[in-house]
Amino acid sequence: MTIFTTAIEQASDILWNSLLLFLLVGTGVFFTIRLRGVQLRRFGEGVHRVFGNFTLRGKKADDQGMSSFQALATAIAAQVGTGNITGCATALVSGGPGALFWVWVSAFFGMATIYAEAVLAQRYRTTVNGKVTGGPAYYIRAAFKGTFGKVLAGVFSVLIILALGFMGNMVQSNSIGDAFHNAFGMSHLAVGIVVAAIAAFIFLGGVQRIAAVTEKIVPIMAAFYIVGCVVILVMNYKALPNAFTQIFVLAFNPQAMAGGVAGVTVQQAMRFGVARGLFSNEAGMGSTPHAHALAKVNHPREQGAVAILGVFIDTFVVLTLTGLVLITSGLIPEGLTGTALTQAAFSQAFGGFGPVFIAICMFFFAFSTIIGWYFFGQSNFKALFGEKALPVYSVIVVVFILVGSTLKVDLVWAMADFFNGLMAVPNLLALLALSGVVAAIDKE
C-alpha cells in the first residue's frame, strides 16, 4: 500500500506542479480581466439574491429544479467540507502558513471562474424525461463539436464519478472516522457503517430530499463552526498580527521566520495552497455547476452572481478562520496533521471539549459534502448509463463511504488530489473555449 500511495502522490505532484497550478489560476485571471472584475461587480447582487428574499420555508425542489438558495446550499454543502478543516490543516503542514495566502489568491480569481461555470450551466441546461439537468458535460459538448466534444464530455463524466462519487466521498468518511476516533475512541469501521447507513437513506430520497437536507444543515453547521473559531481568535487576539505576518511573508519565503515548516519551498506553498483551495471551494473543478444548473432564475447571470458568494463563504470565511486558528495555536511545526492538528488547536481553547466540537463539525461538514458530491456524480452517472442504473451507483458510493472510513488518511487524500486535478482539465478547457458566450451573457 505504501508503494501505491507513493506512486499516486508522485503522479499528483506532476499533474499539479506542471499543469494545474497554472491552468487553474490562469483561467481565473483570464475571466477576471475579460469580465471586468466580475467577482467584485456582481458580489453585492449575489448577496441580495440569496439573503434578500431568504425564508426558512422556501419553495420545495421538484423535477423542474430548485430555488436559487437551495442550489447555493447544495453547492456550499459540497464546498464546505473536510477541505475547510482537514484540508486546511494539511495545506499548512505541507506548504507552511504561506499556503493560506495562495488559497486566497486562487479563491479570488476562482470566483470569476465559478461565475463562468454557473452561467454556462444555466445556458446549456436541458430537460431529460421531464426533469431539468445540466453541468459541465453539457457545455463541454457545446464547446467542442462533433466526436471530440462527445468523448471529452464522457471522459469528464467518468472522472467526476470517480473523483467525487467514489474517491472524494472516501475522504469525507475517512475524516469523520478520524474525528470520532480521536474524540470518542470509536472504531473507524463502526463510524463508517453509521455514515453509510444515513447516506443511503438520504440518497433514496432523490433531489427533493437532498435539497431539503442541505438548505437546513448548511446555515446551521456554518454558524456553529464560525462561532467556535471566532471565540478562539478572540482568546488568541495577541497572536493575530504575527499570524498575518507569517501568511504574507512565508508565502514568498517559507524559511524567512519562525512558524514556517522546514524544507518548504515557494512552489510547495503555492501547490498546496491552490490544490487545497480547489478541494475546498471547487472553483474550476466542474462540480458545483450541477447544482447551479437547476436553479430557477430569470437569467443565467443571476445564478452566476450567487455562485460567487459560495466561494467567498467557503474560503474567505470558513477556511480562513480555520487557518488563523491553526496558525495562532503555534502547533503547525509540532508534527500533527489533518483532523488531529485541528482538534489539538481547539483543545487549547476548549480543553476536552475541543476534539468533540471538531468531531461534531466534521460530521456535518463532511456529511453535507457527501450529499452534494453524490448528487454531482449521480447526474453524470445517469447521463452515461440511464436512470435505471442509478441504484447501482448508489450502492457503489455507499461501499466507498464504508471502505474510505478505514483507510489511511495520506492515501485517500493523494487519490482525491489526483482525480480532482484530472476532472478539472476538460472543464477548464471548455470554460476558456466558451469565454465569449460568458462575456456576452454577462453584458445582457
Spans of features found by a protein language model:
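N-terminal alpha-helical transmembrane segments of multi-pass membrane transport
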Residues: 1-78, 82, 93-98, 110, ...
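Transmembrane helix-loop junctions in multi-pass membrane proteins
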Residues: 3-4, 34-39, 83-88, 164-176, ...
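Membrane-interface loop-to-helix entry segments
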Residues: 23-30, 35-47, 156, 173-180, ...
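Helix-loop-helix module between adjacent transmembrane segments
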Residues: 31-32, 106-130, 141-174, 178-203, ...
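Flexible loop linkers connecting adjacent transmembrane helices
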Residues: 37-66, 90-100, 104, 112-147, ...
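Alpha-helical membrane segments and immediately flanking helix-loop junctions
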Residues: 56-93, 123, 128-137, 141-143, ...
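Selective recognition of specific alpha-helical transmembrane segments in multi-pass small-molecule
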Residues: 109-117, 193-207, 218-238, 271, ...
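Extracellular/periplasmic helix-exit of transmembrane alpha-helices
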Residues: 115-129, 230-246, 254-261, 294-297, ...
